[in-house]
Amino acid sequence: MATERYNPRTSEPRWQKAWEEARLFETKNDDGRPTYYVLEMFPYPSGRIHIGHTRNYTMGDVVARYKRAKGYNVLHPMGWDAFGMPAENAAIQNKIHPKEWTYDNIATMRSQLKMMGLSLDWAREFATCDVDYYHRQQMLFIDFYKKGLVRRKTSKVNWDPVEQTVLANEQVIDGRGWRSGALVEQRELAQWFFKITDYAEDLLSAIDGLDDWPEKVRLMQRNWIGRSEGLSIRWALAEDTAPAGVGELEVYTTRPDTIFGASFLAVAPDHPLARKAAEGNPALATFIEECRHMGTSVAALETAEKKGFDTGIRVKHPFDAEWTLPVYVANFVLMEYGTGAIFGCPSGDQRDFDFANKYGLPVIPVVMPEGADAATFEITAEPYVDDGVMLNSRFLDGMSNKEAFEEVASRLEKETLDGKPVAKRKVNFRLRDWGVSRQRYWGCPIPMIHCDTCGVVPVPKEELPVKLPDDVDFDRPGNPLDRHPTWRHVKCPQCGADARRETDTMDTFVDSSWYFARFTSPHADSPVEKDVVNRWLPVDQYIGGIEHAILHLLYSRFFTRAMRDTGHLDLAEPFKGLFTQGMVVHETYRAEDGRWLTPAEVRIEGSAGERRAFEIATGKEVAIGPLEKMSKSKKNTVSPEDITESFGADTARWFMLSDSPPERDVEWTDDGAAGAHRFVQRAWRLITEAAPAIGDITPKAARDGDAAAISKPAHKALKAVGEDIERLAFNRAIARIHELVNDLQGPFAGLDKADEETRAAAREATEILIHLIAPFMPHLAEECWAAIGGKDLVAASRWPDFDPELVLDNLIVLPVQINGKKRGDLTIAREADQAAVEKAVLELDFVQKALNGAPPRKVIVVSQRIVNVVA
């Protein structure tokens, strides 16, 4: 029987309206069912949703719809990470206020997301630039400040002298500002910091308990926190080379065992000793100034050419006062790590090795592989960086490097310099306190006041929020808040004198470090309602990109602890389960003149082996580039609206999850989308053509007979798809749904002439199929449900239960041994008893041949496992 094609253009808006009118996805905090919180990392409102967003949010939506059907009270909210530089850039370029630009974009993207049929609780929506949100963020800031978790100190920043602003490390390109092109300077500015280092040990040790996080993310966090055990060693300066008033240099090292391989010491350009040495050395002062134009990030320092300047200062070796080593100022040493000074052992470290070769410093082998000959072992082309045996190290020779570590530590702890131990054991962390000051307008104002008499004073909570002024201009470089005629001027809340508001705003990472908690009670007067947030957190399933594996997740873990310690909640970890999805990639297209073209501007010709691309407008051939992450710069983006217009949202959702495992990248192709749409139509045809025969039938599974060929694959798929969704194996779940449609195709062909038992089984199998596709293609599921006369909405119905007997395979294969050696197999009904198994085994040709007409001495049957015939 022919059926009309499924039309998503009419179907999808209709069901979206039905869900909205039923307020189906609005979550009640007082619902008594068990809770389940699923959250995708909220988007920045850049203006358009891209297909990568579609994949991310569809994954979360599948989980949310499935858990809802399983009887959970599901929280699945959406909001906007709305502060940040792009809005200010748009204000400058397009003469539009950041607020207007941001909220216009939010409106556009909200409508795009709604077209995808996501089961989101829009009643909880907020943007981080909403006054209601950043008001509560300011409350948290003050609570953290009063708890001692916030401090103000000078810090080195990237300063763009043209833009008159601080640049993030990513905005410094080859030492220049990304927009102005000006040489960036490193400046010392007073900055606000969250004391995340107070939690370093806890943040590190708790990683072991994050069982539902990817191991690669846990490893990245461990490395970022970077715990190391080492020795802080005080090196005495040679008196005849020391600047006035300086007698020693403290160095932190994780490899004190290599101390006899030291050939130089190096200090950071902003180390006090470097500044002191530069006072009478113009060349050194010039070198330090050059270093100020490098980026401040570890990555910038790692990739830059390693440069040093010999200060002329020398230090005495801790174990030999006659042995002195030069002190360099080096551009790769960080003041923020350890003591801002290192000793270089070129034979055991690649960076030190390169530096020593560049400046003609000795390379002394001090660790060699186990079994190597100390008389012949040399360091030539590269250092030896692994564990081994000590050599050229006096009293350490022959020890393992770990034994040498302990020996050096114990000896130097007993030695003294000016009455204090030469060395002490120390645990260091790579993790630095989190600088949250940004010299920009479009961010959450820091609620602090500067008074000449009282110093820094927090804004009283009853005077919050500190709102951003709307009447600002971006005609000149710098932060508009600094030059606002009235906003920054305020009375000191402590003494009443004239004072100044803090004009820095908060790093946007602050906004995203607690939004998941605010979603639990988004309209509360306090940042969170404690009993409510304790019930919902931690987030059961958090989904987002691997690019946020370190900073966002680490800052969120810190924030949850800080909120706990300031009385807002009672837990430490914000996210129980974490899933990092792959990217959506697409090939790129480039014209001869260098222009990037969108997929819509290109016509593809030829087969897979000889594909050629042509620009539609000109007819000229264009170069096909590699698969890359979709980006606006290379124009290899696909609009979800275009896909929805062509095929419908369900097709986009289905294809996004069907092509590859969710943790891997997926290649967007028009052919793939078309293939997904063909399946949509196939499933629709199967169900609607069966509808007349099953419309008024009561569903009932069949365990035997011809009807069992319908019920068994349906129940097996029901069990397997549920397990796959629980494991986030969406592509496997989709493959099983494909199989089920194939399995039902034959039995459904003659339903109009089938008996009642078969039609009852078909009705139940159809209902199962509809429920299976519902989390993935919710609009199609509702349309199919209506077509078979289903009551209410699929989105509000419970997940069916599978019949355990129907998911068992009827036949099992048992290995058959004769006298303990396998000779073959027996295929038999799973429910066969021992007598039936013995009888069937003795009828096997290879068993009869082995027995040669004699009866067996014994037949041993291990139920559903193995059979052993003892001849």
UniProtKB/Swiss-Prot annotation:
**What subcellular compartments does it reside in?**
Cytoplasm
The residues that hold ATP are: 632
Give the reactions, separated by semicolons, that this protein catalyses.
tRNA(Leu) + L-leucine + ATP = L-leucyl-tRNA(Leu) + AMP + diphosphate
Q: Where is this motif: 'KMSKS' region?
A: 629-633
Kindly list the GO CC terms recorded for this protein: cytosol
Question: Record's Pfam families?
Answer: Anticodon_1, tRNA-synt_1, tRNA-synt_1_2, tRNA-synt_1g
Top EC category: ligase
The protein depicted here goes by the name Leucine--tRNA ligase
